[in-house]
Amino acid sequence: EVQIRHLSQPDFLQQVFADQQPQPGLLPLRGELRERVTKVLGHPYRGMRLRYWHSDEISAWIIDEKSKDMPMTVGVAVGPTGIVDLEILVYREPRGGEVHQAFFRRQYRGMTLSENDTLSGQVDGITGATLSVDATSRVAAMALVLHQVVMDRLPSR
């Protein structure tokens, strides 16, 4: 089994939150939210809840999603203006690993949710990595949905 670790969870959270101490949270995936996530991914999400971290306006999510045969682990940070950071933490396929490169990941910055919970922008694919690109885009859209739900539930400051 191929497993390439690009970034650890603590390093990803440090990159997103710098000197702030993010609050950890656990979001149950049920009811309408579970239906939205299933629609975004094109299949039901395996877990019943998702761990996340948040500060005042930013949430960070670490999500596993199947690429071709194996799951990849993606970290997505979302703020008031959309996606602020996207990292491939662990990649487990023999091909398509180019999705971890900065030129590809930068395309997601600033993307928000359009109607129907799709990404607001187009992503240029990578030849030979179509399934990994699609999986990354599904995770990005899922993180935007989850961020919206969490921010709506936080008490107003």
Name what the model sees in each region.
Residues 1-134, 138-157:
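Flexible, solvent-exposed loop/hinge segments and secondary-structure transition points
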